[in-house]
Every structure is written in C-alpha cells, then in structure tokens.
C-alpha cells in the first residue's frame, strides 16, 4: 500500500457543469460576505472554454438571485501580444461578451493586460498592473486553467516561482493548441503579457479547473509530481488555499482513479477487477492466464486475490470477461434501427468506420446523422479549387454562367481581401459546408452505405463562423429529438471522444443527451465510440470489434475521401499526425494489447463503450 501521492487538495465532480456551479457558488458567497463587511471583492479571472461555465452561472446568479457586482474588482491573467481589444481573439472582448456586459460591474474596476500598447511601454505597463493589484488589496480569489504544457496564465515551462507580470514568448505546443481559435497556428501571436507565478501565488485563494481526457496526463503531473519549473502548475502545491477542480475525465490518470487498489482497501466491482488484472498483466508482461499468486502479492493485489479461490480462478473470470467483449460481425446486432451521430462530417469513418460497415452488412437500418457542417475546418484554397472547377465546367457545358459568374467573383474578391482569422462570408461558409457534405457522402460509400443513409443536421449552435460556438439551444435539441422520433432507433452511436480541442464533440454529446431526456419512445442503447483523439481502455470497453487488414485499409480509404482534412487538418490539436495515421496506430495498438493479454491475435480493433439507455421522458 502506498500513500496518496496527491500534493494539493483535489475535488472531482462527474461533470463540468457541477464544477462550474460549485466554483461560481464559492465566488458568490465570497462576494456577499465581503460586501456585508463593507469590503470589495477582488477576482483574478481566466479566459478560454474552461471558465465559461462559471461565468454563465455567475450571470444567472446575478439575474435570478441579485448577485451584486458593483463592488467587484477584476484582474485578468493575460492577453496575447500584439492584440487589439476589438479583435475576435482578444481576451478583452472575450471577457465583456462572456461576463462583464451581463452584470452590473463598474467598467473602471475591470483590469485586463493591454495587447495594444507600444512594445517600449510593456515593462511600464506590467509594473502598473502589479501596482493596481496591490492597491486593490490583492486578489481574493483566482481562477486558473491549466495548459497542455502545465502552464498557468501564460507562465510557460521554465517560469520562475518569483516571476511577475511580464511579456513572455509562447511555447510551440501552446500556440498549436490555440491554432483553432486563430484559424491556423501561423496566425497565433508568438507572445503574450501574463501575470507571473509569484503574482498568482499571492492570491488568497486559488481554484484551478481542468476538464476532459486530454488534460488527464498534465493534471497528474501537476497534482502528484514534484515541484518542477517545467510544469508551472506544480508551484500551486506550495499554496495554502489552492484547490484543483476536475471532472471525471481529467481525473482519469490520478492514482485514486487509475490504480485505486494501490492506496488501500476499495469496494471491488467486476469492472475494477478487470482493470486491476489488465494492469497487472501489463506490469508483469505476462498474459492474464499466466499470472500467479506471487504476481498479485508483489503488486499490492493481495486483497483482490483473497476474494477468489485462487489466482487461476480469478484469471479465468477476467479472461472470460475480456473474451466476451470481442464481437465480430456475427455477434453484432442484426435487423435493428441504428443512428450514428457524427459531430463533424468525418468522425463517423475516423472513429467507427469498421463497426459502421459491419452494422450495415448485418441488415440493420443504419443512418449517419452529421450534427455540424464542419465548414470552418476547410482551407480557403479548397474553395478556390472548387470555384475553378465550377468556372471551367460552366464553360464546357454552358450552364448558368450568367448567374454563376457574379457569385464566383464575390467569393474570390472576399477571399482575396480576407484577413487571417476573419470570419468567412455566408457564401464562403455555404461552399465550405457543401465541400464537407460531398466528402462525407463519398466516404460512407466506400463503406458500402448509400447516400440516402446520410442526414446533415447542420445544428444551429455551430453556425457562428468561428471556433467559439453558441451554447446548445432549444432548436439544436429539437432537431435531434425530431430525428429520434422519426427513426425510433434501437441503438445510437455517439462520439465519446470529448477531448476534441474545440469542444464541438462535447457540445454535440450534450445535445444528444438533452434530446434523449425528452424522447418519449423506447430508450435506445447508447454506444460511445472514440478514436480521433484517444481510444477507450481495454478494461473500460464493452465491445471490441476486430478488423482484418483489408477492413482497416477500407476504413482508411474512407478517411481519405475527406480530402479537405487529409493532408493537414486546420485544427489537428497537439497531435500533428494525419487522422488516418492516428487511427491506424490506435486500432493496431488495441489489437496488440488484446494479444498481449492472451486473447486471439487480430490485425486491428475498434473499441466501444455501452451505457444504459436514458430514462424515457415522463408522459403528461
């Protein structure tokens, strides 16, 4: 048994919404308590997708419960440099649009580093920012996120514990992650003005928030690792009142979640037993059926062994459970109605191309529902290529040239004067949408589906022309609910790949969940696929679908049909490999692990998690 390796208090909630409500309520209580004492409240604020839920809850508390911001003073962590306050990418604009203009805060009480000052004045501006914080009495409550490099604010690897507000160079990984917001890494500023680690550490209370599987590894390093200049978030271990707030996905790599049996007695479940035995198999390099009593004892699993007659009996139970997960085509459903929800027009083939084809081969009524257009992920040069095709063919076949010519000219002129990161015109967005649609239709035909088996939902929340989307609204839910009522599916497949850097997967998941809550029909089984950003662990997966070499090649061929995404996707995240390369490696790796555990050897595998059906809506 080992001691809990967590070096900072951690609170884990199952969902991001629960985290946002908890932190917002803590801030509201602080504002009210200090107001009653005749004091102002000084908040340190962050930007990005992580704190938006907090800001929405604070706005709700202001509107519905009268939370008063007139005595609140705010200091933001950072701002890109150079950056005009009016820019779509400005943190000034972000804060006003997402919080300040919705509450009764005094404009003079808002402080955000300026990205528009002359370079020669930056040092003076940084000193003024530090003085303003001190004159306000210091920060009472600081909100932080954590970057892929472990940065807090823009304190990149190597930042000193005593650093103050200053101009910094942005890490390559940080700029890559931000590429989605700027429509390409080349458009991301190379510098930023940020509060220093020392400035942050002087806050009286700190809340660091992290959500999603993609943050799990860096969260583990920040929470369980030694204090390290290479991971600025580890400095928070020295703060007396810092707390890390995580959703279940971001907490996945913490010892308490990943290997809880190492920390002491636990309530064993069949799933935990499988996880422990798979972990032991990998730790020892032995297949499941070859594990012996000494392996269990030497790796802290004596309590698990004591629950069974022998190591052989336990090994057999786990081996049989793992074997039951493997389901080739003959063991997959037949004659069912199936909806495959695909957040973007390529997620279906990327993450579930193999199972999609097998379900279709099994005489199921399969429909692929593309939830968003994916149009912001199309490069401008792709549009120019299609425009050239239209122009040439209109001359060849003499169709609609008089009506087509003005449109072509309008689009070409717009693209010629378009600034980096500028929102596309309606015409350009429409063309990019159609490009993604024809690619999606071409891709599913490679998997033997017909074009009429596709439905393009074009959910409204996505239609901003920007990476930052609107919240899921009633119309989004109605569209999905209407589809459920029309098809009345037995099974739905949903993206469980919630680490999508720009959040669309998570929002599409929320839209389906809300629709299921209102759906009055027989609840469908919900299958969750992954693949674009990570794969399900073997122990967590409920279905493992074997793919032959030919089937994997066909799946990759389907991915190739998404030509606008193939060579270099506009928003690849930190992983710069093409999607087909990620998928090939992940699907092969899953099969290889199954082989190492002692199960039959397969060329590749897709993994699916099955959740219980949602409870049907109550009838009036």
Where are each of the predicted segments found?
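Conserved phosphate- and dinucleotide-binding cores of soluble alpha/beta proteins
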Residues: 6-7, 11-14, 18-19, 81-89, ...
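A conserved mid-domain beta-alpha-beta active-site/ligand-binding segment of alpha/beta enzyme cores
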Residues: 536-592
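Structural motif
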Residues: 42, 73, 140-141, 205, ...
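A short, structured active-site edge motif that brings together acidic residues
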Residues: 71-81, 111-116, 455-457
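Active-site beta-strand->loop->alpha-helix modules in alpha/beta enzyme cores, enriched
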Residues: 119, 275-345, 349-528, 557-561, ...
């Amino acid at each position: 048994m080992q001691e809990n390796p967590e070096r900072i208090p951690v609170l884990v909630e199952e969902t991001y919404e629960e985290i946002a409500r908890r932190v917002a309520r803590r801030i509201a209580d602080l504002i009210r308590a200090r107001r009653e004492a005749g004091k102002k409240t000084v908040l340190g604020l962050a930007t990005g997708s992580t704190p938006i839920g907090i800001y929405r809850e604070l706005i709700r508390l202001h509107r519905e419960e009268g939370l008063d911001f007139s005595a609140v003073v705010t200091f933001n962590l950072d701002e890109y440099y150079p950056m005009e306050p009016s820019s779509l990418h400005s943190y000034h604009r972000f804060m006003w649009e997402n919080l300040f203009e919705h509450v009764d805060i005094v404009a003079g009480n808002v402080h955000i580093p300026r990205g528009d000052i002359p370079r020669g004045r930056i040092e003076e501006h940084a000193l003024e920012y530090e003085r303003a914080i001190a004159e306000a009495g210091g920060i009472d409550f600081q909100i932080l996120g954590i970057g892929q490099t472990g940065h807090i604010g823009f304190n990149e690897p190597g930042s000193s514990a005593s650093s103050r507000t200053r101009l910094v160079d942005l890490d390559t990984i940080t700029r890559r992650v931000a590429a989605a917001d700027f429509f390409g890494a080349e458009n991301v500023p190379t510098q930023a003005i940020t509060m220093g680690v020392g400035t942050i550490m002087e806050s009286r209370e700190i809340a660091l928030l992290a959500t999603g599987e993609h943050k799990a590894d860096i969260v583990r390093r920040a929470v369980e690792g030694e204090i390290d200049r290479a991971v600025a978030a580890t400095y928070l271990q020295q703060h007396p009142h810092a707390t890390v707030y995580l959703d279940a996905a971001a907490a996945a790599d913490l010892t308490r979640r990943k290997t809880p049996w190492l920390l002491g007695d636990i309530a064993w479940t069949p799933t935990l037993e499988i996880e422990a035995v798979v972990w032991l198999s990998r730790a020892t390099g032995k297949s499941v059926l070859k594990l012996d009593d000494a392996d269990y004892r030497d790796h802290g699993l004596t309590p698990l062994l004591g629950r069974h007659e022998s190591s052989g009996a336990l090994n057999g139970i786990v081996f049989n459970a793992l074997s039951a997960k493997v389901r080739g085509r003959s063991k997959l459903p037949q004659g069912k109605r199936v909806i495959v929800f695909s957040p973007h027009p390529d997620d279906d083939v990327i993450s579930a191309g193999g199972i999609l084809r097998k379900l279709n081969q099994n005489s199921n009524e399969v429909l692929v529902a593309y939830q968003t257009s994916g149009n912001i992920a199309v490069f401008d040069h792709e549009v120019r290529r299609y425009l050239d095709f239209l122009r040439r063919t209109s001359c060849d076949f003499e169709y609609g040239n008089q009506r087509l010519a003005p449109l072509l000219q309008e689009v070409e002129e717009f693209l010629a004067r378009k600034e980096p990161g500028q929102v596309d015109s309606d015409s350009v967005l429409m063309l990019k949408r159609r490009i993604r649609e024809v690619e999606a239709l071409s891709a599913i035909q490679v998997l033997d589906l017909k074009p009429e088996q596709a439905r393009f939902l074009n959910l409204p929340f996505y239609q901003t022309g920007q990476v930052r989307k609107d919240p899921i609204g009633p119309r989004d839910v109605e569209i999905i609910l209407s589809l459920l009522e029309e098809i009345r599916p037995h099974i739905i497949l949903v993206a469980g790949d919630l680490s999508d850097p720009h959040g669309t997967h998570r929002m599409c998941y929320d839209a389906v969940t809300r629709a299921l809550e209102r759906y009055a029909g027989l609840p469908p089984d919900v299958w969750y696929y992954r693949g674009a950003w990570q794969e399900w662990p073997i122990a967590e997966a409920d279905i493992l679908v074997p793919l032959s070499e030919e089937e994997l090649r066909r799946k990759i061929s389907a991915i190739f049909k998404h030509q606008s995404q193939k060579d270099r996707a506009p928003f690849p995240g930190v992983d710069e490999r093409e999607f087909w390369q990620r998928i090939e490696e992940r699907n092969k790796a899953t099969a290889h692990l199954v082989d190492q555990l002692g199960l039959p050897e397969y060329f590749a595998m897709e993994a699916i998690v099955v959740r219980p059906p949602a409870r049907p809506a109550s009838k009036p």
